[in-house]
Amino acid sequence: MKIKKLILGIAIISVTVMLLSVSGFADSTEDGCIDIMAGKNATVDGSVLTSQTCDGGYDSRLIIIPAADHKPGTMAPVYKGIIRAAPEFPNRDPLVKLGEIPEVAHTYKIFKIAYPIANDQGVIVGETTLGNETECSSNKDTAIMYIEQLQIFGLQRAKTAREFIEIIGELAEKWGYADRGEGLNVSDANEVWVFEVYPVGPLWTPESGKPGAVWAAQRVPDDHVATVPNKSLIWEIDPNDTKNFIVSSNYKDAAIELGLYDPASDEPFIWRFTYSDRRKKAGTDRRTWRVYNILAPSAGPWLWTERSHYPFSIKPDKKVSYKDFIAIFQDEMIGTEYDNTEDQAWYVKARRGEHAGEMVKSSLATPEPSREMQTLLNIYSLDIASGKGCSYYFVSQARDWLPWEIGGVFWFGLDNPKTGVFVPVYVGNNEVPESWTVLDRTKFDRKSAWWAFAAVDDQINRLHGFLNPKLDEVLIPMQEEMYAKQESIEQEALKLYKNDPESAKKFLTDYTYSLMEKTEQVYWGLFENFLFETNNNHLRLYY
């Protein structure tokens, strides 16, 4: 009997572990980026919108690299390790120089971070990792281009989104693409594109005469929105439709050579099912499901069983604004079937107060439980757009009726978009506070703005039910004030610009600078106050 019980117990444990692995725990280890974009006719004011959340431990220092002129014969260095290039970084990849390429005569000012965001011409870029099939893994002995280095070169050299794509595509082909499959959303004030690039296998060498990368870009229709949550988005390609597609010459040949596509099969060549990592888990699709359900519910029902066949883009039910994208970045799927806070494990019997004896939701219930909490309570976390492991995020506007110094703006923040603030950074800006340009993740550092936002987010996630409402009391009015002032600030900048563009840029620089200083100090104050409120000699909950 004891042996039977032991065998039964082992069987139950084995099945439980298996189900948890398949259903949920694995999801929490997926890439967690999400990019959302909108064409100019899909927005309330004609803006072109792009965005990104950067998950994981990446360099979140916002560094402005000024425009520069270069003498003939100047060479530009090519680096590996830019995404974790902060001087003080745990387990950081060393910054390694892989080679040099000829520099151009003039490079534009860019806003550099792990994955560089924008230039002073109004080209704005978001990144999301796609992964790739094993067959097209790169030859790191000969290929030297990583996606973040390509972004730097593209932003320094391009005046339009289309030009950016052509520049980095050519560089990846010539010098070899060494990174994983990557996706970019690339915008200017007129259009937005989805760009995807993959390595061409471990046998590539520059001497082969073949392209060292395979890539494709598709234009998002002007009246559509699209989202890329760490998964390839492009379906079939028409290389003759140059208005809507830009592709490498080997976009299909590389797949045939690598054994990823058989033209004799009579099957259509589907880009997204060919090069991208098809083992991506359900969490990536869940974010797409949420975006389409929010922005285009009437085009549904968006069935979960059909999640791998969602379209490249969709026309939203109503025109969207940058505020809608920010709301999605802060969405925690509350009230949906994927609401992580509604797992029954979070409910406990109250021991005191007006609800004594009743089952109440614990203040520990959080949309983003840690892996330890998932294990302890036998629950699992479903991916959401916001993320406790995020490094930075932005939502951008590009507007063709304003000078690019004013019309290009990205609403930027550090750590988790749900608990953080979105500060407007104009592409004409020339400076940010020093605390936003330094980062030491090896120790707690009050000299770094990132730590203020990360510390508050950590507190919120540990006692979400108790602290999140207190954060909202401060965050929501502060964010709404920034929204309300945007039009008047930009009108004042426009007046200045007509007489002296430099004075307009200084005005916007000073405005953003003051907002960054203010929000950082507010968050340091929140951190200290939350320490007091959750001290175990002070806090008394009802259970």
Could you tell me what each predicted segment is?
Residues 474-543:
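Histidine-centered catalytic/metal-binding microenvironments
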Residues 137-141, 149-158:
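Second-shell loop/turn segments in exported
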Residues 9-21:
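Bacterial N-terminal signal peptides
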Residues 253-409:
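Glycine-rich, aromatic-lined ligand/substrate-binding cores of catalytic
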